[in-house]
Amino acid sequence: MDGLRQRFERFLEQKNVATDALGALEARTGVEKRYLAAGALTLLGLYLLFGYGASLLCNVIGFVYPAYASVKAIESPNKEDDTVWLTYWVVYALFGLVEFFSDLLLFWFPFYYAGKCAFLLFCMTPGPWNGALLLYHRVIRPLFLKHHVALDSAASQLSGRALDIAAGITRDVLQALARGRTLVTPASASESPAALEPDPKSSQTTLLKHK
């Protein structure tokens, strides 16, 4: 328990958007950052348990700040933070895939969204206890190194088939357009210019009748 509290306090001493906001509140209210953070986490947990729109709030927490931090990482000259947030998005994508198939079952658990939010916060926690980095190096990376050759081969075959299908569809469309143009051309060509010119004899006959 003491180790968890020490990690929590070390996190509050780091420089990021959350700690900057807590520092501003501490300066205005006189309440220490750790109490403000504990209160905010308690309110968040209660809302995720009993509040309306817990799913939306959980997805916002798991997406908005990481997206903001990812843009900052792209614009910064340091590439270490790029690796951190790329790792987070890999874990986030796999978690979303698993959640898609298990959501119908897990949705009915009362602590589902609170647990999901806690997991996402754990994955984006800066420092050596970053959950995304731990999951990547202990679970995802070993599986990837073991199966990446087969995955690359399957992806190459799928991309080749997709290109063949696209080429076949394009060829069929062009052939259909060519057949349609062939059917239209003889009908228009049958109306020769000679047939469209007025007959001089008929014109003269019409003038004599009027006289």
Curated annotation (Swiss-Prot):
Region annotation Disordered: where it falls in the sequence: 188-211
Record has Phosphoprotein as a keyword: no
Membrane topology listed for this record: Multi-pass membrane protein
Subcellular location per the Swiss-Prot or TrEMBL entry: Endoplasmic reticulum membrane; Cytoplasmic vesicle, Clathrin-coated vesicle membrane
Superkingdom of the source species: Eukaryota
Subunit structure: Interacts with STX3. Interacts with clathrin.
Organism: Rattus norvegicus
Gene Ontology biological-process entries: detection of light stimulus involved in visual perception; regulation of intracellular transport
Protein's name according to its UniProt entry: Receptor expression-enhancing protein 6
Gene Ontology CC annotations of this record: apical part of cell; clathrin-coated vesicle membrane; endoplasmic reticulum; endoplasmic reticulum membrane; photoreceptor inner segment; rod spherule
Residue stretches spanning the membrane: 44-64, 89-109, 117-137
Polar residues composition bias: residue spans: 201-211
